[in-house]
């Protein structure tokens, strides 16, 4: 029996917000829009409805190692405990924000919040936006905002080059959006709501050196990266490690995604930030390994097949960086680590 606990009203995580077509491989639904991939995966789960239950609008609030149980809350009033023989932590990531004066004025959003408003609830967060960050998320959300009729005043990026795929950058550049490299936001303008922002040039040490420029906008969208959400793994006593290539603290794991706590597995962005296609493969690896550990029959050779798919997804410069991070946390023999 499998229990899936989902904090949102609808399963699918970030996929339900994604209206663009995914890259990757055919096995991971390349060329399919994110929200449609979520439907495909949900149909796959529903085909095992006698074995899989989904708790929606439910948050796992903590793990208590001494009792070997989780606390969870559904909605705002129902609290209960969960016990499991094996646990896969696929909690994803949380948005990073940056400090600047007036960043608490209404109208400053994370990119994920903007996607939720537009693509889930059909609400425009503003009419003219300053996008902070030119990674894939910043570029994709900029394009989605423009598709919805929002004007993108500019995209500012602190690094000396665009961090996302050039295909995404080219789309918004063709539509007249300037991408200002070695620039960042200095302060937001406004009192009760955002009326503009001041941006500034940066030197090679990321220090503000000017010139400054005022941007008129009613929305500031922050897209400066993600950090793995790993609180449950830490509470379970899993060996953690800070790995810059994986964007934060992550759990050490073996090829089966098993952590130093033999009853806990990790998958997806909780184990390091990369594409959704890799998260889907890691989820299959973790599920296969957990089932095998419980004594259920599994297909021989599947683990090697899934690792081969991961390697094909982790090509290029970004993939090489991720592979470096994986090498830091991958453990061949937990017994050897325990006795080291």
Regions found by a protein language model. Name each.
Residues 1-340:
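Residues forming the flavin
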């Amino acid at each position: 029996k499998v229990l899936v606990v989902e904090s949102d009203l609808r399963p699918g995580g970030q996929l339900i917000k994604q209206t663009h077509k995914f890259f990757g491989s055919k096995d991971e639904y390349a060329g399919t829009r994110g929200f449609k991939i979520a439907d495909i995966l949900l149909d796959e789960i529903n085909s095992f409805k006698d074995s899989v239950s989904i708790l929606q609008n439910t948050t796992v609030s903590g793990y208590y190692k001494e009792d070997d149980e989780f606390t969870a809350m559904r909605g705002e009033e129902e609290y209960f405990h969960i016990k499991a023989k094996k646990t896969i932590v696929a909690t994803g990531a949380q948005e990073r924000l940056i400090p600047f004066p007036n960043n608490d004025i209404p109208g400053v959003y994370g990119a994920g919040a903007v996607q939720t408003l537009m693509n889930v609830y059909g609400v425009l967060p503003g009419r003219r936006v300053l996008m902070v960050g030119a990674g894939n998320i910043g570029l994709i959300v900029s394009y989605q905002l423009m598709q919805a009729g929002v004007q993108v005043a500019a995209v500012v990026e602190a690094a000396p080059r665009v961090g996302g795929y050039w295909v995404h950058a080219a789309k918004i550049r063709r539509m007249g959006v300037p991408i200002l490299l070695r620039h960042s936001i200095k302060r937001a303008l406004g009192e009760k709501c955002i009326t503009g922002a001041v941006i500034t040039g940066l030197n090679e040490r990321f220090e503000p050196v000017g010139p400054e420029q005022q941007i008129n906008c009613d929305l500031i969208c922050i897209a400066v990266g993600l950090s793995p959400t790993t609180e449950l793994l830490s509470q379970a006593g899993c060996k953690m490690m800070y790995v810059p290539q994986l964007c934060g603290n992550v759990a050490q794991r073996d090829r089966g995604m098993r952590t130093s706590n033999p009853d806990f597995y990790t998958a997806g962005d909780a184990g390091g930030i990369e594409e959704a296609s890799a998260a889907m493969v890691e989820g299959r690896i973790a599920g296969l390994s957990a089932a095998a550990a419980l004594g259920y029959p599994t297909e021989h050779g599947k683990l090697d097949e899934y690792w081969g798919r991961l390697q094909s997804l982790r090509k290029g410069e970004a993939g090489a960086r991720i592979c470096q991070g994986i090498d830091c946390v991958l453990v061949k023999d937990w017994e050897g680590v325990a006795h080291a």
